From Swiss-Prot:
CDD domains: PoNe_Nuclease. Transmembrane segments: none annotated. One of its GO terms (molecular function) is nucleic acid binding. HAMAP family: UPF0102 (MF_00048). Belongs to the UPF0102 family. This is UPF0102 protein Acid_2433. NCBIfam families: PRK12497.1-3, PRK12497.3-3. PANTHER family: UPF0102 PROTEIN YRAN (PTHR34039:SF1). Gene3D superfamilies: 3.40.1350.10. Pfam families: UPF0102.
């Protein structure tokens, strides 16, 4: 019975729905950044006002990086990071200001990164430090 539940859960996890892509990409990015020596301090951080969300907040050396994770199954419509347009960058900056204010961090120590994930048989992960 338990084996059947595990197989069913695995099938659900592997479905190719966009909401699953995002979650899988965030999980891969989280593990990747940790493997690169980052300390993850927040996942899916939401502002108190509910006006924004940041996928990952990490310390990379002495820099606090606000990380947007973008995931696609292919590059047919461009690389994942191309989805981070000016409007999205503005929302991320607003959410980052909220985090910095609450965490009492110097804004000069802040950086904005993008982790691009392409889900293939062997996922491709690219970390764009200081992307904007």
């Amino acid at each position: 019975m338990i084996g059947l539940l595990y197989r069913a859960a695995d099938r659900l996890r592997r479905r190719r729905y966009p909401e699953n892509h995002g979650r899988i990409g965030e999980d891969l990015a989280h593990r990747y950044l940790r493997s690169q020596g980052c300390t993850v301090v927040a996942r899916n951080y939401r502002t108190l006002a509910g006006t924004g969300e940041i996928d990952l907040v990490v310390w990379d050396g002495g820099r606090l990086a606000f990380v947007e994770v973008k995931t696609r199954s292919s590059t047919d419509f461009g690389p994942p990071e191309s989805a981070v347009d000016a409007e999205k960058r503005d929302r991320l900056r607003t959410a980052a200001r909220d985090y910095v204010r609450r965490a009492d961090v110097d804004w000069k120590a802040v950086r904005f990164d993008i982790v691009s994930v392409i889900l293939q048989a062997s996922p491709k992960i690219e970390w764009l430090r200081g992307a904007f």
